Amino acid sequence: MGKIKVTPCDIKGLYVIEPTVFKDERGYFMETYNQNDFHEAGLDMVFVQDNQSMSVKGVLRGLHYQKQYPQGKLVRAVRGTVFDVAVDLRTGSETYGKWFGVVLSAENKKQFYIPEGFAHGFLVLSDEAEFAYKCTDFYHSGDEGGMAWNDPEIGVEWPIEEGMELIISEKDQKWGGFRDAFKF
């Protein structure tokens, strides 16, 4: 029914995906995932787990990855707005150590596909945001890894507004830098 617009990003393997939205006087309808449309676009992943979180403005989650059980993720903002980031940790990649960020919102309905081999995180820009993600592997708490969100070697340009108070978990404050991150 739907069909999707798939835009490759500057880093190979990352894609911004825009669904077809059908609007009328009742509201709108869209398919957030259709396996046939994704396969037709060359995106041949299998999702095994869906997650959803709610966060308030200034929450910064990340940058996370799993080492032995890496996860590809299809992420979107169900409500509110986030700045979503992926950092390439694939050692053989031409863009190793580079990052890409995109604004995802309930209004723009964009989704972001991040394959295995990336660190991932997001910053909430709206008063609240509900964030949904489909994963290609299950969450394994003992396999979790991460890197500092503000590592100057990577230099992610987070859109932190003047006066915005960041809310970062104790765990995320303790991650090492890019040099200490797991390499895929």
Model-derived segments and their meaning:
Residues 112, 120-125, 133:
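Short beta-strand His + acidic residue motifs that chelate non-heme Fe in jelly-roll/DSBH
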Residues 1-107, 126-128, 135-184:
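Non-catalytic, conserved peripheral segments adjacent to functional cores
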